[in-house]
Amino acid sequence: MTRMMARPAKLFVLCAILLSQAACDEFKVPIPKDIKPAVDTYRLSSLAISDLSKPDIRRPLLQLSREACNRDAMGRLAAEIDALGYRRESADALVAFVDRCGRADGFLGAAIEDLIAASDYQGAVAIANRLLANDATEPQYYFDRGRAYEGAQQDEAALADYMQVLALSPDRASVTSNLFIRIADLHAKAGRYCDAVSAIRMWVSADPERADNAQAKGIIARYASHASCPTSYASGQESFARKGSNTIQVKARINGVEGTFIVDTGASYVVMSQAFAQRARIDTAQARHIRLQTANGPREGLLAQADSVKLGQVEASAVPVSVDPAGKAPFGQGIDGLLGQSFLSRFEVSFAPTRWSIRQHS
């Protein structure tokens, strides 16, 4: 009899526990009133109450509830909820802060990182576009947008942004190898292995100490094993005398038209005046607008392609070039342009006090 009575009692207790749990599931602990203004303003209601109550999160929420545009508090709050994995919520809060309180480019940059982490690539692109509207000459914004495009598998858009980073970075030695590797990987993904190799060589050439870099050599060997570059891609060798000046002027032929160019290892592209581009029949009808960082400040350019660039016996085909749409002599009197890395990186280039040489990579 005792056993028979014990079984219903156990069932009653079990049912009571289950009913209690169900009731708890339906009952939502309210957000504390003292932090609710900030939680509502910055759309943080999806965070667990236990997380909102953590001292390092509650403290900035209290400050933001009193002063909605407290930048220090928002910076601390975003960092804390980031650390807990609330990347989407952090991005939304940062963007909402900027919308409400005014320009804060650092917050938008952090929001891009959060959105990329949350795989919201189009959202990240949209925020990067806002930053570029504020400052179209900041390389970091193009790099961030390129990463978002790459995540969205919009490879050509990503590549265009990565190349824009180089165009805005006159000191390539300070540019991270990560950028060049991304450029190379995108070229390789499209089957352009010669261009992939050139991208890594451009990074190597930026600093003589990188000549024996094992990682760079390994990447070059890997890409080179996929396809042999055609002779027209880069061929020949030449050696030239140097005058006393640090500036090296050469006679180069673009699409068969001769011009005077300055050898500029810091220029990302072969750059030419609009007048010379017209003589050389460079088609700019479908050219993409880019921005270049030069010794004289930022400039606009039209990114096109030359069928051939020839320097003595050295020649390359299908070379990206930038056309300067400015005045008649943007590079100085008698100078038609700059011979930059879109040509030079295809070759081994070395400089000595009295001579300099250029030759096809072995």
Predicted segments with their positions:
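Bacterial N-terminal signal peptides that target proteins for export
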Residues: T2-F12
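Pepsin/retropepsin-fold aspartyl endopeptidases
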Residues: C24-S362
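Bacterial N-terminal signal peptides
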Residues: F12-Q21
